[in-house]
């Protein structure tokens, strides 16, 4: 009977240890995914700001060109 109790205790203990290891790995994977998502959103924000800045510059150049053309006539 004592042998069965020890065996059962050992099985339960090893099960708990493996569950805690799996939970830890799962949390690490979720953290990595969240970090990748943050990096991607930062890249998108940077890309959007660059596109916006390029559009502003192009608009100013086009407006200047139109003003120059209107001034020549």
From Swiss-Prot:
It is found in: Secreted; Target cell membrane. The keyword Signal applies. GO terms for biological process: defense response to bacterium; defense response to fungus; innate immune response; killing of cells of another organism. Keywords: Amphibian defense peptide, Antibiotic, Antimicrobial, Cleavage on pair of basic residues, Fungicide, Immunity, Innate immunity, Membrane, Secreted, Signal, Target cell membrane, Target membrane. InterPro entries: Dermaseptin_dom (IPR022731), Frog_antimicrobial_propeptide (IPR004275), FSAP (IPR016322). Residues 23-45 form a propeptide. Residues 30-40 have a biased composition (Acidic residues). Expressed by the skin glands. Residues 25-47 are annotated as: Disordered. Residues 1-22 form the signal peptide. GO terms for cellular component: extracellular region; membrane; other organism cell membrane. The keyword Membrane applies. Antibacterial peptide with activity against Gram-positive and Gram-negative bacteria. May also be active against fungi. Belongs to the frog skin active peptide (FSAP) family. Dermaseptin subfamily. This is Dermaseptin-S13. It comes from Phyllomedusa sauvagei (Sauvage's leaf frog).
